Regions:
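Beta-rich strand-turn-strand
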Residues: 125-126, 136-149, 155-159
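Short secondary-structure boundary/capping segments
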Residues: 20-21, 27, 86, 117, ...
Length: 198
C-alpha cells in the first residue's frame, strides 16, 4: 500500500546548505519544511538536530547542542539568547520566551509600538544537558533548567529549576528527583558510534 503524504517533508540538504547550514547531511540536521525560522543566521546547530512541523523560531540567538529535539508546534521567541544543551527536548506546543512585555500597564506593549514607549524584559534562557520540557509548557525570560531537569506538561517555568529534578505546576516547583541513568546511556551511545566508525 502506498503511503500518501502532504507537507510531511524535511528540508533537503541543498535547501539547508542554501540557508547557511553547512554539512547538514553528515551532521544529521533535520528542519521540517513547515517550520518558520525568522533568521537562520542567528542559529548555531550542533549535530543530530530535529525541528518538527509548524515550529516558529523568532529569536536573536539560538544555540542548539547535540541530539536536540524541538517538537511540533513549538515557539521560541525573544532578543536574548536561548540555549538548549545536548540531549535536550521540548515537547509539542512548548513555548520559550527570552523577551517579554511589561504587563503592569506602566508601558505600551507589542512590537507595533516604538521601543521608547515599551518596557520589554530580555533575559537569557538556558536549558541544560538532558533536560526534558513537557508538552504545552512555557519558559519565561531568565529561566534556567540545570542539567537533567524535567518539566511536566502544561507547566510555567519562572527562574531556576535544580538539576535532576522533576518539576510541575504554575509556577513549576520540584516534586521529586529524576534518575541519572541517561548518563550511562549517553556513554553507551558514544561507544556505539565509535564502533560504527571502525
Amino acid at each position: 500500500m502506498t503511503v500518501r503524504r502532504l507537507n510531511a517533508g524535511f528540508l533537503s540538504t541543498n535547501e539547508l546548505d542554501a540557508m547557511g547550514v553547512c554539512d547538514a547531511k553528515n551532521r544529521n540536521i533535520l528542519v521540517h519544511s513547515t517550520a518558520v525560522i525568522v533568521n537562520f543566521d542567528d542559529i548555531f546547530f550542533g549535530e543530530n538536530i530535529r525541528i518538527d512541523p509548524y515550529t516558529v523560531i523568532s529569536c536573536k540567538n539560538l544555540v542548539l547542542g547535540n541530539h536536540v529535539h524541538i517538537a511540533t508546534g513549538c515557539g521560541l521567541f525573544g532578543r536574548a539568547t536561548i540555549s538548549m544543551g545536548d540531549f535536550s527536548t521540548i515537547s509539542g506546543h512548548g513555548l520559550i520566551y527570552s523577551s517579554s512585555d511589561d504587563y503592569s500597564g506602566k508601558a505600551l506593549t507589542n512590537p507595533t509600538v516604538p521601543a521608547d514607549f515599551t518596557s520589554v524584559k530580555h533575559a537569557e534562557v538556558v536549558i541544560g544537558r538532558h533536560c526534558v520540557i513537557g508538552a504545552r509548557s512555557t519558559l519565561l525570560p531568565g529561566s534556567q533548567l540545570e542539567e537533567g531537569a524535567a518539566v511536566g506538561s502544561s507547566s510555567l517555568v519562572i527562574g531556576t529549576l535544580p538539576q535532576w529534578s522533576i518539576s510541575v505546576g504554575i509556577p513549576a516547583k520540584p516534586i521529586k528527583s529524576r534518575t541519572r541513568d541517561c548518563l550511562e546511556h549517553e556513554l553507551t551511545l558514544k561507544q556505539w558510534r565509535q564502533d560504527q566508525d571502525v
